[in-house]
Curated annotation (Swiss-Prot):
It comes from Danio rerio (Zebrafish). Its main location: nucleus. Zn(2+) 1 binds at C103, C106, C120, C123. GO terms for biological process: cell differentiation; nervous system development; positive regulation of transcription by RNA polymerase II; retinoic acid receptor signaling pathway. All-trans-retinoate binds at R284, A295. Residues 58-72 have a biased composition (Polar residues). This is Retinoic acid receptor RXR-alpha-A. Residues 195-426 form the NR LBD domain. Homodimer. Heterodimer; with a rar molecule. Binds DNA preferentially as a rar/rxr heterodimer. Composed of three domains: a modulating N-terminal domain, a DNA-binding domain and a C-terminal ligand-binding domain.
Length: 430
């Protein structure tokens, strides 16, 4: 297939949408499919297995969060440490790490070794502030004030002198500050590198470019007979059919997608179209109460869905996707990254180079994690929370496919050209 098939769709003289493939004399152009890449000849195994999960591909960045709990502080005391008083010896067999210490400065309970000495959080913080701000103190008495748990705040001069006498090191505070600075610089460099490979700005642009311009919303919350031309199942199918037209345009705007072999682009779109559309209308429905907002501007209420016999899957969309997206206030950049992760599915059958697709997915993971750290620094678990929506999206996508195949089988629901093409694709290729 010629690369020109990936040119943008256009409006004809009548205002109707024309496929980019309509200008070619291919025998497969009769349907006028919006999937310019879909008409590429493929082998019998180009359809992705619907049962493939996200498990093995979960980002190593997520794993790093789960493995970073080891302490940098050594709480095992060296024998004979000056100024440290031990509680009575523990019974034999008690791990040394469980032995409790008291603060060498004031006698309060120690929280570990800080700047070379076992000390409490209060004395640790006092010493750090003194060094970092280069503070100087004076003693009102004879520079021999008692420093204990009750009186440690009475004389800052004597408290600081005792910190030094017990072995606290000024240079340890300065080294800690330098390490923090270097760590921050490394994180900025890592964030910049990840974003250069897979810029989230481009992913956001892709989302905004295909966003439906719906000015008015039509609400359907009155139950209608299932054979009505306006029943919710028909409305959803018609909206999905229209959105399939924009899906290729969206994918072409995702960084590096158009660089993949044409047949691989076809495979990835066929494998993920249902999840990609579900993610979109779920996020679009965040502001809607007890319903979903379709790209056509139609608001489908859950009462209508229950009347049409699709209440169970409809409620799953509301509780597992729409509600979760609303609660965490998922933004469009995060939505775009999740959809890009779905698109770059290395487990799709028939890919010529799954490793290349997996590398692109990893780049999206890295960019999304960096974006979350930068945009939401007060929510360290946000990246993981976003990824946890993917299994629910996969499960709901499979169930929706089952419903669509059933509607196609019984023939009660009109299914338009493009959606029918996607449902019949596996049979056409075998």
């Amino acid at each position: 297939m010629h690369p020109s098939l990936l040119s943008p769709t256009s409006l004809g003289p009548s205002g109707s949408l024309h496929s980019p493939i309509s200008t070619l004399s291919s025998p497969m152009n009769g349907l006028g499919s919006p999937f310019s890449v879909i008409s590429s000849p493929m082998g019998p195994h180009s359809m992705a297995s619907p049962g493939v999960g996200y498990g093995p591909s979960i980002s190593p960045q997520l794993n790093s969060h789960m493995n970073s709990v080891s302490s940098s502080e050594d709480i095992k005391p060296p024998l004979g440490l000056n100024g440290v008083m031990k509680v009575p010896a523990q019974p034999s067999g008690t791990p040394l790490s469980l032995t409790k210490h008291i603060c060498a400065i004031c006698g309060d309970r120690s929280s570990g070794k800080h700047y070379g000495v076992y000390s409490c959080e209060g004395c640790k913080g006092f010493f750090k502030r003194t060094v970092r701000k280069d503070l100087t103190y004076t003693c009102r008495d004879n520079k021999d004030c008692v420093i204990d748990k009750r009186q440690r705040n009475r004389c800052q001069y004597c408290r600081y002198q005792k910190c030094l006498a017990m072995g606290m090191k000024r240079e340890a505070v300065q080294e800690e500050r330098q390490r923090a600075k270097e760590r921050s610089e490394n994180e900025v460099e890592s964030t910049s590198s990840a974003n250069e490979d897979m810029p989230v700005e481009k992913i956001l642009e892709a989302e905004l470019a295909v966003e439906p311009k719906t000015e008015t919303y039509i609400e359907t919350n009155v139950p209608m007979p299932s054979n009505s031309p306006n029943d919710p199942v028909t409305n959803i199918c018609q909206a999905a059919d229209k959105q399939l037209f924009t899906l290729v345009e969206w994918a072409k705007r995702i960084p590096h997608f158009s660089e993949l072999p044409l047949d691989d682009q076809v495979i990835l779109l066929r494998a993920g179209w249902n999840e990609l559309l579900i993610a979109s209308f779920s996020h679009r429905s965040i502001a809607v109460k007890d319903g979903i907002l379709l790209a056509t501007g139609l608001h489908v209420h859950r009462n209508s869905a229950h009347s049409a016999g699709v209440g169970a899957i409809f409620d799953r969309v509301l509780t597992e996707l729409v509600s979760k997206m609303r609660d965490m206030q998922m933004d469009k950049t995060e939505l775009g990254c999740l959809r890009a992760i779905v698109l770059f599915n290395p487990d799709s059958k028939g890919l010529s180079n799954p490793g290349e697709v997996e590398a692109l997915r990893e780049k999206v993971y890295a960019s999304l994690e960096a974006y979350c750290k930068h945009k939401y620094p007060e929510q360290p678990g946000r990246f993981a929370k976003l990824l946890l929506r993917l299994p629910a999206l996969r499960s709901i996508g499979l169930k929706c496919l089952e419903h669509l195949f059933f509607f196609k089988l019984i023939g009660d629901t009109p299914i338009d050209t493009f959606l029918m093409e996607m449902l019949e694709a596996p049979h056409q290729m075998t």
